Amino acid sequence: MEIYRGAPALSAFKTTKQLEQLKQAGIPVKELYAEYQHFVDLHNELSDEHRSVLVQLLKYGPEMPAHEPQGALVLVTPRIGTISPWASKATDIAHNCGLKSIHRVERGVAFYLQGDLSAEELKQAALLLHDRMTESVLYDMNDAQQLFRSQEPQPLSSVDILAGGREALAQANISLGLALADDEIDYLVENFRKLDRNPNDIELYMFAQANSEHCRHKIFNADWTIDGAEQPKSLFKMIKNTFETTPDYVLSAYKDNAAVMEGHEAGRFYPQPDSMSYGYSHEPVHILMKVETHNHPTAISPYPGAATGSGGEIRDEGATGVGSKPKAGLVGFSVSNLNIPGFKQPWEENYGKPARIVSALDIMLEGPLGGAAFNNEFGRPALTGYFRTYEQTVDSHNGRETRGYHKPIMIAGGLGNIREAHVQKGDIPVGAKLVVLGGPAMNIGLGGGAASSMASGESTEDLDFASVQRENPEMERRCQEVIDRCWQLGADNPIAFIHDVGAGGLSNAMPELVSDGGRGGRFELREIPNDEPGMTPLEIWCNESQERYVIAIAPENLARFEALCERERAEYAVIGEATEELTILLNDAKFSNQPIDLSLDVLLGKPPKMHRDVARLQTEGTPLHLEAADLNDAADRLLRLPAIAEKTFLITIGDRSVTGLVARDQMVGPWQIPVADVAVTASSYDSYHGEAMAMGERTPLALLNFGASARMAVAESLTNIAAADIGDLKRIKLSANWMCAAGHPGEDAGLYEAVKAVGEELCPELGITIPVGKDSMSMKTQWQQDGEDKAVTAPMSLVITAFGRVNDIRSTLTPQLRTDKGQSHLVLIDLGKGQNRLGGSALAQVYQQLGQHTPDLDDTETFKAFFNTTQQLVTEGRLLAYHDRSDGGLFTTVAEMAFAGNCGAKVALDELGEDNLATLFNEELGAVIQVSDEQYQKVMDAYKTAGLGDCVKRIGEPTHEDAIVFTRDEQNVLAQSRTHWRTVWAETTHHMQRLRDNPVCADEEFRLKQRADNPGLLADLTFDPSEDIAAPYIAKGVAPKVAILREQGVNSHYEMAAAFDRAGFEAVDVHMSDILAGRVSLEDMQALAACGGFSYGDVLGAGEGWAKSILFNDRAREQFEAFFKRNDTLALGVCNGCQMLSTLKQLIPGTEHWPRFVTNRSERFEARFSLVEVQESKSIFLGDMAGSRMPIAVSHGEGRAEFANPQQQSQLEQNSQVALRYIDNWGEVAEQYPANPNGSPKGITAVTSDDGRVTAMMPHPERVFRTVANSWHPDEWGEDSPWMRMFRNARKHLG
């Protein structure tokens, strides 16, 4: 083993934060320093030349002053016995650079602690400095040798039930954490006695996973008796009733990893399999939808818990039918009170928590980063979500009890697209090869399915921790590229059957795969790729290593599939074959035995059906006592309640532009305010058709009325999606995610009532189907504190996600009030018809009350009339703005609309009810619309004709003032400056950003939000974007070839190809593996586009690993050097491609003054819609655009331009090689965050070579080349946005 020191691992502000944390724990640390250490395991000695290459590979990241470490060493390494995802990618890069002597490169962090620390204090410090799930701690650098020790495979064990009987299995149930019910223990004992043998631990574990509540949904399939009366249907049958009543437009329901609904016809854009040139295939683009929960892992370890939640849901989408494509995601969280230090709110009580779970604050600081990071690296935009906090001690039928989300809800969902011929899974032929596609087995996530099925507190802490998985999104991207290549083959798709690997690992996925395909399976344990050789057979077969799929492939199609995997560098292994006999046979060549020999009948047979015998209990509630509440105080409290407060800290961490198909993200208007009701994507780059998704949940209402809570969740998802042009209500399909503390008095019957309200009544009446969903039935946390039994129980929680196809994505409305459209009116559609009920409201919550009567959907016909009329008005373009009424009531709705429009509003309450509190803050169903003077009468007539005359009231108008005013009898009852409420609304996000990110950046952004004079984004062009300057050249007929270049982990190649294709290029898909293998030569290309993403997962520096695999590989270096030296070529590098080109500058003439691009100043991934100004430069791409100012998509974590010295920067500027700069909304060069999202000096964000042929930029023009893909744009822009000009300039140059 050789050891190489790396750069400092913590920036100044992160060092300060870490020091504070240690001091708060009472550990006397005076100084702290951390740096990376690289451990290199060698097959044989490195030559001097190879050692030099290795040293250059291990020099990456921002320049930081060198430091001589002092103090006690705490060395944090990847967990001993594992191979980290970082190591596998870094080792790949080393091998691609010709360093074949290297067996493995691992990385650790050496913390040096100065202070008078005892051995015990050092151990306490180590606990805070590492994550025990994925890391180990060493105290001597040489002990890192343990990382490379190979471990001996462990043997099988069995449970002796032949001698020990039922008691032996009952003991194993506890020690293995199987969560088996009593009747399941009886079932197993009976079946193994029939077989006259003892079960192996692996067989019991496999049975427990396959039959866990998590996988089998026993409660949803149970028989029910309520108050002594037998119920006619199971919960699942009531959900299925929605499909039986309205099967319209559903292509697949209840039987696959996701549901499928009918989409529009459009051109699917992808590289054609025969030529690898991109093109359009016009066909129906059907929509798949899925929403998952990952609650238990997120409570234990939020970052990996939420990351693998998103990763698992993405795999569900990709494994639908015989392969499909995930497209856009959503994330949601429900947690207990945040109790932010220094920002504790008057309604927040701190009830305490068990040590084994993290606090709500830590979940919200870490969990969203995990979910966002997975989506970002995979390349899926996260476009909507929700965030609720609830923790309150209430009077209920059980006496005083605390209700809340100590066991959080972590929602991960999304939509994708699938070909019509691929919706149904095929047959598995006998002899089909059974393949694992994806990463290796690792000893993680054991028992995830069973652990998720227990109330928190029933299992041991070690088992809880073992049940969390860890993520490697770049691996999942590689697998998805293979699946994409398969479905793009159309009728030649080699996939016969596919499932993702989730709960229970292969022990669940492989039996499910073969049994669904009507077959059994014979497997070889030692063929499973395995990064931890010391695992037992149980651990190899049952671990929940992520990023894996199981696939059945006919033998004659295997070679083609293997070639696709090799091109994408996606790991795969053939581990078995399908058999006629319906058994699972697992052989272990190492120990010459068979750990599993079970019929599918026993494994998936008919364990006893559950029966629930429960009683109805519903809290009556008491009237709210708010006589002393001041309206201004109530407004401020509500704006600080996380469910209502600004959520920028949850949004800008997530890429919202990747794919180039995003038509509506969360950020609205020129001021980029996060208030959108709905997420919208385009079907393709050649279409205005699309897809929409929106969420709804009103969980606190369930404490007073289970049915109302469920109806309101459905209704809210519909009032949200109504902002998009859906048309027919029957076109909308719902995912229902049910969470409940099963067994808690009253909750089971309440769940039944809620499912019945939605499945048997509301959805059939609306003509809406619920073809997909998920349940999580163990939402209670129990522990002991100072000898006292404590518990926090979640309300029965239904989270609904509505999906629909969109007729015209240009018609989507936002909450932004328009003050540039002449005289206009604000109109409230009040579906509560003046009842103004406040039970379970946000207002009640912020005063620590519950109330009595909740809002409800009382009249289905009225609701349908509202939806249909609003849709008609959306389609006809008669409305200027739309925002539904939800948490915080009318006050919040109007305030958010004014924030989005950066304007004022004047609202009269006279016709809305007599009680100001109830009128302002009730959360009855409804919406506020803005209507121009000329459309006003037509709009009012449309609602009246629909029978909604008594619901529709003109309430006021937007104003140009910095004031939001609510009046009664023309007297102000509640009034403040918009800036005041905008600032209060931003406080929660500001405090969270300060805790999590660079506090200096958080403060700069907060100050910007307090400015009343912010003019917002602008567009000021020096050219006509509607002019197609490439048209004369396209007419000549011969298209120049552009290599759309990608490396493993790149995810922005489709949109790059689409932009070049539109400009008249022949866009060719080129993987780095094609160049290294000699399949493709850059000699044949006139242009090259290095695309964005996370090549090698940004290991060894963003874009640096990719560049170095070119610099230190003879064939690749030769190809690129020759390409850049030709004077008839052009090259563009965007984001990751920009980082890559800047590291390749020794091969690119005229780039010696280019900077490197390193970690953002905020030290956070930044997804923004930022203003830039095109500079006078030599760039051929930006040639005639100089002086133009316009917004552009930004999505990166390492975009800060770092120059070797000030002279380098001034030389670049003097040579006119700076091509783009960030500017602020006042048109000045941006130095402050977030107008300058990464901290680059003088806003520099694009550079060009001396001759202008090579341009590298961090922002993403290829994602916004269509006007509809811009988060905001001036009304007058046509189909092409101004950024399309770049690509046409390139086409014109090449002639």
From Swiss-Prot:
Q: What is its EC number?
A: 6.3.5.3
Give the annotated active site: C1135 (nucleophile), H1260, E1262
Q: Name one Pfam family in it.
A: FGAR-AT_linker
* Positions that bind Mg(2+): D677, E716, N720, D884
Q: Which NCBIfam families match?
A: FGAM_synt (TIGR01735), PRK05297.1 (NF003672)
Q: Tell me, in a sentence or two, what this protein's role is.
A: Phosphoribosylformylglycinamidine synthase involved in the purines biosynthetic pathway. Catalyzes the ATP-dependent conversion of formylglycinamide ribonucleotide (FGAR) and glutamine to yield formylglycinamidine ribonucleotide (FGAM) and glutamate.
Report what the protein is called.
Phosphoribosylformylglycinamidine synthase
Q: Which organism is it from?
A: Idiomarina loihiensis (strain ATCC BAA-735 / DSM 15497 / L2-TR)
Phylogenetic classification of the source organism: Bacteria, Pseudomonadati, Pseudomonadota, Gammaproteobacteria, Alteromonadales
